[in-house]
Amino acid sequence: MPYDIAIIGAGPAGATLARLLDKRYKVLLLDKRDLMEPEEGERTKCCGGLLAPDAQEVLGRMGLAVPAGVLVDRQLFLVRTIDFDNHLERYYQRFYLNMDRKRFDEWMVSLIPPHVDMGMKCRFTALSERSEGYEIAFIHQNRIYTERVRVMVAADGAWSNVRRQVFPELEGIRRYITIQEWYETQEDIPYYGAIFDSTVTDFYSWIIAKDGRMIIGSALEPDREARSKFEKLKGELRDFGYFFGKRIKREGAYLLRPLSASGIITGNDHMALVGEAAGFISPSSAEGISYAIRSAIALADSLNQGIEGFQYRYRQNLKSLKRNIMLKRIKSTAMYNKTLRGLIMRSGILSTDIME
């Protein structure tokens, strides 16, 4: 018997959708990780692991409270903004939750009801269109399996295999590669760091303290100079007074940045895209969890009214989310223009004075 809905990717978007779909549907959820019985040292998503206020708000609206076991030491409420272009530094108050991203994903998966079939350690490979949906292929323990599905959902992130197989590259979205390194540190870092340097990236870089370690990361153009630019960033931070101990690990991933509404793809009559696979991510901060969850809620609402015509309803449900993305795009114009950013930082507006 074919599945009504197959979801590729069990991150916040896929897990939320699987949890909210009506139990009358036969649902399959696939992920290449094992988020139900994780193994020590298993690869994790390259993510700073900060839960922004927008994501906290949407979790609260769903009646969900983040378990203490998901949070890490320490919880910080200040952002140190370092602008190497303008030789400026300011502090701003922000209320992020500092968390373990892997444990967050595991918690979201644990909320999925038992009627959903979950295939962990399953790597989606291919699809073929049929008159009433798709036939999908995936690999589990070196064996190839196929299933027929009426609706396929791509929730597999920026480097979405589903999106790349079905939809062309669009000019309305820009692709980056994120490099993130974890270091041992003896430093007391009571803030998050946001670093701007246009010689490194036209986006931004970051510093995060997490469980006694220091994370240094950057969103870079995916070219041959990415590694050297990342090393340049680390050199600047050393000169600025940061000390890195032994490197623990290095991570990398792709990141999307929507430049216009045309870069967002919602799918077709037998397919839907959610979260970053669709292009839902903040173009100013790269925050994606709130958009992943909100797009999944919009899709669940449209599918729970029936499969027929779901794509039209999904697009209608997404209008406010698309407007939000475009407002963030306008905000990013000021943030990433070094002249405008310099004027704003020099004015001290919304900044916080640190007590000595």
Task: Name what the model sees in each region.
Residues 1-5:
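Extreme N-terminal starter segment of soluble prokaryotic enzymes
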Residues 14-15:
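N-terminal Rossmann-fold NAD(P) dinucleotide-binding loop
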Residues 145, 151, 159-234:
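Conserved FAD-binding catalytic core of PHBH/FMO-like flavoproteins
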Residues 301-356:
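C-terminal helical "tail/cap" subdomain of flavin- and related membrane-associated enzymes
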Residues 6, 20-45:
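Glycine-rich FAD pyrophosphate-binding loop
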Residues 57-61, 65-165, 172-176:
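Conserved N-terminal helical subregion
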Residues 9-11:
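Glycine-rich Rossmann-fold phosphate-binding loop(s) that bind the pyrophosphate
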Residues 126, 224-299, 308:
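FAD/FMN-dependent oxidoreductases across multiple families
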